[in-house]
Amino acid sequence: MKIDKLEGKLILKNPKIIDPLNETIFQNDVMLDNNKIVQIGSIKLTDDIKTIDCNGLVLTPGFCDLHVHFRDPGNGDKETLESGSKSALAGGFTRVCTMPNTVPAIDTPELINNTKLKNYQYIFIL
């Protein structure tokens, strides 16, 4: 389930939460305020706060794909940094590591830095 950027408060009611930091999986409510988690626990519902029933759904941190082929630079007709980043984000991946199978191959510090700088324009926030 994708939640578009919202202003104000939102309650995710009863998702299964995977917390890798504490190595726990539990079920509870989550309150967001301007897209930031502000409370986890039993939250009293009110009519003025939008609520989404997440029973049966899983809430996790974003995933990292360690092997992507964006083909940019050189073969942008197959996949660009922008299209690949948007596709990754739609699939729950908030970080990606691109392979150097590009033209030219991204295999020198200079090319890595240039690609990194180009990537900054493709930071997408949900």
Predicted regions and their residues:
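N-terminal metal-binding scaffold of metallo-dependent hydrolase/deaminase domains
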Residues: 1-46
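Hydrophobic/aromatic beta-strand patches that form the interior of the parallel beta-sheet core
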Residues: 12, 50-52, 64, 97
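Generic alpha-helical hydrophobic packing signal
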Residues: 16, 29, 52, 125-126
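Short C-terminal domain-edge/linker segments immediately following a structured domain
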Residues: 42, 46-47, 93-97, 126
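Active-site metal-binding motif and surrounding structural segment of the metallo-beta-lactamase
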Residues: 44-59
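Metal-associated gating/positioning segment near the N- to mid-region
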Residues: 57-119
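Short helix-capping segments at alpha-helix termini
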Residues: 119-125
